């Protein structure tokens, strides 16, 4: 597959306003978001085997189940009660609440539907080392960098609805083992992600007040795109090129 990964990012320039920062953020998303990755093109275009889709869902589970951990860390960074209250709904979006299904539950419906043993998925024993390292790096980032950068790292949600819509239509049309029930996670995120992105964007526009702070916001988004891209690089290396590391999940057709 030939994929043009050239970018149209503007030359480095001081970010003198919130509008200039937002323009830069959107340029970063257009150039670096993981919808451009070859593995996603294969996934959405029906080019993967069921085993390769299983490997993707299994590894992505580690990211999904760590998101509320990351969000709990973000909450812990703020003395401002209003910010904590706003961010708290993200925990329930993923963890769920008493009597209410969350995103992790919906992801497990996907892995169940793909024929993966739930206990094995939840153990995370079969994930790739790069998956674990990338996801843990994200948690460490929001713990160790400024609260502003912690929120900015979530701005990939600005670009998520498009990839979710593409994934829903592409996977439903190309794979006979995919149905609307197992795609419920992505359907829900079509409404959740824009709400979350709108808040995060407002926050960084209001609180990044110097060119240096605005540059830090942009670099936080770049870091997050690298976290996502690294996971797909690892999946492609292991399950498309066939270099599965010891201890990782091996699809039936590769055994």
From Swiss-Prot:
Classification via Gene3D superfamilies: Heme oxygenase-like (1.20.910.10)
Domain of life: Bacteria
GO biological process assignments: pyrroloquinoline quinone biosynthetic process; sulfur compound metabolic process
Enzyme Commission no: 1.3.3.11
Disulphide-bridged cysteine pairs: none
Keyword rRNA-binding: no
Enzyme class: oxidoreductase
Catalytic activity: 6-(2-amino-2-carboxyethyl)-7,8-dioxo-1,2,3,4,7,8-hexahydroquinoline-2,4-dicarboxylate + 3 O2 = pyrroloquinoline quinone + 2 H2O2 + 2 H2O + H(+)
Entry-linked InterPro entries: Haem_Oase-like_multi-hlx (IPR016084), PqqC (IPR011845), PqqC-like (IPR039068), Thiaminase-2/PQQC (IPR004305)
GO molecular function (one): pyrroloquinoline-quinone synthase activity
Keywords: Oxidoreductase, PQQ biosynthesis
Pfam families according to UniProt: TENA_THI-4
Pathway: Cofactor biosynthesis; pyrroloquinoline quinone biosynthesis
Family, as annotated: Belongs to the PqqC family.
NCBIfam families: PQQ_syn_pqqC (TIGR02111)
Function, as annotated: Ring cyclization and eight-electron oxidation of 3a-(2-amino-2-carboxyethyl)-4,5-dioxo-4,5,6,7,8,9-hexahydroquinoline-7,9-dicarboxylic-acid to PQQ.
Protein name: Pyrroloquinoline-quinone synthase
